[in-house]
Structure formats: structure tokens, C-alpha cells
């Protein structure tokens, strides 16, 4: 199980542990990036491998517009921190399990091919 902390990013805060930022305002809410956005959440990890793998999971969730259903606001839509926390962990876990199962299936097919 991945261990990470999600909180609101504050300007001029320096993070020593591996981290990534996720935009929380506008129609691009959920977009991950290594550098901070003005309006963003920060996800802090214990190690670099978890950070890297979850970056791509967050990126795929953003590309599939997963976060659009959780946006609120009439003029400038935004993503609430509790909604993000509630949805991100289960989605990340599900996608990690599916990826591991896919890797096992590919390995089994390669063995059958020999």
C-alpha cells in the first residue's frame, strides 16, 4: 500500500520529501506537475519510486477527465480537498492492482509463447 500525505500547497513552502503538485482550480483540475501551481494540492511521499508511479496515475486520471464529475463552482470550477482525498487513494490503489495484474498476464503469455 502506498503511503502519502495530501494537503493544500502554500506559496514559498519548501518540501524535503519527494512530492508532486495537482492543480485544483479550473477545467484542468487534477493535472499533476513537478513544479507548483498557484492553486494546487501537494502530495508528499516517503520515496521517489512511489512519487513517480503516482505521478503517472494522477496524469491518467486527469487525461480521462475523471475529476470533472467532482468539480464545484459556477464561474470558476474547483476541486475540493476532501473530495480529492476521498477519491484519489481508492482510484490509485485500483489502478496499481490492475497494472500489476496486467504485468502478470503479459509474463504468463510470454512463458506460453516459448
Residue ranges and their predicted role:
Residues 11-12, 51, 95-97:
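A short acidic, often aromatic-flanked loop/helix-cap motif at beta-alpha or helix-coil junctions
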Residues 17-19:
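Loop/turn positions that initiate beta-strands
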Residues 75-100:
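A short glycine-rich beta-alpha junction/loop motif
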